[in-house]
């Protein structure tokens, strides 16, 4: 994956997150600032997702800790092989919102 493909892929992920939260009537605000995407829930807790361009990684930080994901075999996986979408759903649950990401 080159740099342009990396940014395009992450932008699609961020669009998908916003769309899925909205479609499931989740009370959360999404904000993009450069390489950082922040989800702020009604209880004012946050999940922060950011691009790490030099490493071509996607990072997720929440109450559950920090996770780093690399693009492998068509999916974003952490070093344990856990999918980004599954970790994001778990993070949302830890912040008080049950979300199903497809």
Curated annotation (Swiss-Prot):
<dbReference type="GO" id="GO:0008198">
    <property type="term" value="F:ferrous iron binding"/>
</dbReference>
<keyword id="KW-0479">Metal-binding</keyword>
<dbReference type="GO" id="GO:0008199">
    <property type="term" value="F:ferric iron binding"/>
</dbReference>
<comment type="function">
    <text>Involved in iron-sulfur (Fe-S) cluster assembly. May act as a regulator of Fe-S biogenesis.</text>
</comment>
<protein>
    <recommendedName>
        <fullName>Iron-sulfur cluster assembly protein CyaY</fullName>
    </recommendedName>
</protein>
<dbReference type="InterPro" id="IPR020895">
    <property type="entry name" value="Frataxin_CS"/>
</dbReference>
<dbReference type="Pfam" id="PF01491">
    <property type="entry name" value="Frataxin_Cyay"/>
</dbReference>
<dbReference type="GO" id="GO:0005829">
    <property type="term" value="C:cytosol"/>
</dbReference>
<comment type="similarity">
    <text>Belongs to the frataxin family.</text>
</comment>
<dbReference type="InterPro" id="IPR002908">
    <property type="entry name" value="Frataxin/CyaY"/>
</dbReference>
<keyword id="KW-0408">Iron</keyword>
<dbReference type="InterPro" id="IPR047584">
    <property type="entry name" value="CyaY"/>
</dbReference>
<dbReference type="InterPro" id="IPR036524">
    <property type="entry name" value="Frataxin/CyaY_sf"/>
</dbReference>
<dbReference type="GO" id="GO:0016226">
    <property type="term" value="P:iron-sulfur cluster assembly"/>
</dbReference>
